[in-house]
Design a protein with these regions (language model features):
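Conserved phosphate-handling catalytic cores of large alpha/beta enzymes
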Residues: 2-38
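Conserved functional hotspot residues or short segments at active or partner-binding sites
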Residues: 28-29, 33, 38-219
Length: 219
């Protein structure tokens, strides 16, 4: 939805919804909502997850009333309920364990990254003055992972070894990306985190393949 920020006298701000959101092709992607159905609106994402829509394209169904022809190529897409991608990438749930969720939700992954940089900022800037050098050479060491586990124990987060081992590569990537964000900028965070983003990598593959691009997005 499109929201207009309105400053208030006490320094706070409200964001007032003023219109639905349309893409440049003229396609409405506003999630539908009706008066009296607020609970359904807020539970939409979890309901889609429970129906398997994030894991299998076959679980997603659109009524014909949502069909829309794009303005230029006249491809059939579906409007009014979010964007159905041209190429469906299922969510990989294997690495996103409950233990990983607790570490992130408690702020520990972010905190251990900040603590590391507070101790090593000058050394890191001297060793990695350029981001590309950092991206290529910096490795999250086991000592830092042990520090994270100790912090988790102090917060009474019960250690789950099997879940930790499954999520460990993802946690290490997130720590590296968070350090890059604070050492350089947000753009560098995404350059690292997107290296392991299947949707992003598939999009790059399609964009860089003219034949595939035209087949999927042409008239």
């Amino acid at each position: 939805m499109v929201q207009k920020p309105i400053p208030l006298p006490d320094g706070s701000m409200i964001r007032l919804t003023v219109s639905r959101y349309y893409t440049p092709t003229g396609r409405c992607i506003q999630k539908p909502y009706e008066n009296g159905k607020m609970e359904e609106y807020h539970h939409d994402l979890i309901d889609r997850y429970n129906r398997g829509e994030l894991m299998s394209a076959d679980s997603i169904h659109f009524p014909d009333s949502m069909k829309y022809n794009t303005l230029v190529t006249e491809r059939i897409v579906y409007g009014g309920g979010g964007i159905m991608p041209d190429v469906f990438i299922p969510v990989d749930t294997a690495r996103y364990t409950d233990y990983h969720r607790k570490l992130v939700a408690s702020g520990l992954v972010n905190r251990v990254s900040m603590n590391y940089l507070d101790r090593n900022r000058n050394r890191m800037m001297a060793k990695y003055p350029k981001f590309q050098q950092y991206k290529q050479d910096f490795v999250v060491e086991e000592d830092l992972m042990e520090e994270l586990l100790k912090m988790a124990g102090d917060e009474k987060i019960e250690f789950e070894e099997e879940q930790y081992n499954r999520s460990k590569p993802l946690i290490m990537l997130q720590i590296k990306a968070l350090i890059a964000r604070d050492l350089y900028d947000m753009a560098q965070y995404f350059q690292i985190i997107n290296d392991d983003n299947p949707s992003y990598q598939k999009a790059l593959q399609i964009i860089n393949n003219k034949e595939t691009y035209n087949r999927l997005l042409g008239r």
